[in-house]
Structures are given as C-alpha cells and as structure tokens.
Design a protein with these regions (language model features):
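Short beta-strand element of the alpha/beta-hydrolase
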Residues: 72-81
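Alpha/beta hydrolase fold serine-hydrolase catalytic domain that processes acyl esters and thioesters
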Residues: 156-301
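Structural signature of beta-strand start/N-cap positions in the alpha/beta core
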Residues: 74, 103-105, 142-144, 171-172, ...
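Short beta-strand-to-loop junctions in surface cap/lid or active-site-entrance loops
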Residues: 63-72, 225-230
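A glycine/proline-hinged amphipathic helix-loop "lid/cap" segment
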Residues: 1-65, 300-301
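Catalytic nucleophile-loop/oxyanion-hole region of alpha/beta-hydrolase
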Residues: 87-88, 94, 102, 107-142, ...
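Gly/Ala-rich beta-loop-alpha elbow adjacent to hydrolase catalytic centers
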Residues: 147, 151, 155
C-alpha cells in the first residue's frame, strides 16, 4: 500500500458523515446526503435541458442533457449513492465538466432508487435511457456509458443487457470505482474497511437494499464480475487505491482483457472511493476527464 494523498486525508477529516450510512434508514440516508452536499462552484456554464422519458407503466424517467445535441459523441451517466440515494443534481458539476472537457453530450439519468425499487428496476431505467440516448441524441450511433460506484455497476450491467439482446447501442463503457460483485472478502475490502469515505459496512447495507433476496447477488446482471464478458464494448476502468471496491474493479478489467475485450485499467494512487465525481479533487477529476476524452476519441468519434 502507498500513502493516502494529503488532500484526500484533509477531505476525509471534513467528510465524516453525521451518522454512519449503514445505521440509517433509506429516508434518513437521503436526508443526510442532501444536508452534507457541498456547492460545486466553478463548473462550466453550458446548455442543459431536463427531459422526461415514458416508462412502459406510464411513469416517467428523468434525464438531464448537457451540451448541444448534434454530431458530438454521447455518454450516458449514472450517479453513485449505493442505489439508495442520489439525483440529477448530485453530479451536476462533474457532468458539466465532462461535457465541456471531453467534447461530448452527457445524458445523466435519474434512475429509481432502492429499496422502494430494487434490482432489476434501476437497471431497467438504465437500459431505457441508453435506448433513448442512442436513438434521439446520437442518431443511431453507439453511445458510451459511464457511472460512479453503484452507477458504474449500472453502466456495466447495461452493456451486458445490450450484448445479450443484440441491440448494439453501446460502444464504450467507463466504470469509475464501480461496484462489480456481491462479495466482501478481498484485500481491498480488508485494507480499506473503515475510515476511508466508503466502508465495508456501508457496502453491505447498500447491497441489502438493492437486492430483494441475497440470492440475487449471484445474478450476473447484479454481480457483473460473474457475467460472461465476451463481446462487451471496449472499456476504460478507473479505480482508486484506498477504496474497498478497488480489487473487484481491477478484477473486472482483467477479466475483460481475458475475454478479448479492448480494455484499459487506470488506478489512481492515493485516492479514495468516488474521487472522480467529487469536486474536492479537481486535479484528479481533470485527469479522469482527459482519460475519458481519449477513450471517446478512440471508440466513439
């Protein structure tokens, strides 16, 4: 293990939740998240629009579009929050910087949250958003999917569905510190179990709300690490050294390579979980966006 970056250590001192996430009800966790959200100043002032997509049951799925729709590549973004909390405003600054810095249109997805809407309903929302973005924003060209933490899980799972159904809508996947497995026994879980933003107990709590039955954790569209990965789109996998999810993310990248999928793995040493979408890490966030831009240029332009 290396050393925690000094600015990451400073962030952790002020980012301690008032109550451990795992000790709260979902409603309490959502309230705590909103209360602890810090203003993200300095993000580019770019064009945005909110759109409601009809679901088959007559309800609507909200998405937010960043950038001017035209010939630019499209990335569909899924926020983090352990499938339990989060909304379109959670990563608004990141989506603005991503659109501006990578020269893409971003479609951010307000997918349904658990436990009110458990697996596979959030994934169904992800796939609906991908289908709409592919048709309406990209003009039938392949889109990319990108997500942080639980959102990274949805990004990967949407690729699996796209492959299984033969729809060919996704041309690039970018999981950021993604959840890939309903398992908690590896080196990074043990080494980073507590005190580093995301804890092992938090992850057990998140999974407990996402799955109606623990047995669903073996489903390869939930535990994407257990899926057949052959035929998935090219990947840029981002991990953080001081993250319980580091090892499962890196295992996912290695399995993609073994399956013949063009993949790159970038570990950010000294960083903590979800750093890429946090405004507290502007230098690292800019590096991630540059990495994303390079992948987009290779696979989507």
């Amino acid at each position: 293990m290396g050393e925690l970056a000094p600015h990451a250590a400073a962030f952790l001192k002020v980012a301690v939740p008032a109550s451990p996430w795992w000790s709260l009800t979902p409603a309490e966790a959502r309230a705590q998240h909103l209360a602890s959200r810090r203003p993200d100043t300095g993000a580019p002032d770019i064009a945005t629009s909110d759109v409601d997509l009809p679901r088959p049951d007559g309800s609507v799925l909200g998405v937010r579009i960043y950038g001017v729709v035209g010939d630019s590549p499209v990335l569909v973004f899924f926020h983090g929050g352990g499938w339990v909390y989060g909304d379109l405003d959670m990563a608004d600054g990141f989506c603005r910087r991503l659109s501006d810095g990578a020269g893409v249109v971003v479609c951010s997805v307000d997918y349904r949250l658990s436990p009110e809407h458990q697996f596979p309903l959030p994934l169904e929302d992800a796939c609906l958003a991908v289908a709409w973005a592919h048709a309406e924003l990209a003009g039938g060209r392949p889109v990319g999917v990108i997500g942080s933490s639980a959102g990274g899980n949805l990004a990967i799972a949407s690729c699996i569905v796209d492959r299984d159904e033969g729809t060919g809508r996704i041309g690039l996947q970018i999981p950021l510190c993604a959840v890939t497995d309903h398992g908690f026994d590896n080196t990074s879980y043990r080494d980073n179990a507590d005190g580093l933003f995301l804890t092992a107990d938090d992850m057990r709590w998140y999974w407990g709300h996402y799955l109606a039955d623990p047995a669903h954790g073996s489903n390869p569209r939930a535990s994407v690490l257990r899926a057949d990965l052959a035929g998935l789109p090219p990947a840029l996998v981002i991990t953080a050294e001081f993250d319980p999810l580091r090892d499962e993310g890196e295992s996912y990248a290695r399995l993609l390579m073994r399956a013949g999928v063009a993949s790159s793995l970038v570990r950010y040493d000294g960083m903590i979980h979800a750093f890429a979408a946090l405004s507290a890490f502007p230098v690292e966030q800019a590096r991630v966006i540059a990495d994303v831009a390079a992948a987009v240029d290779t696979y989507l332009r």
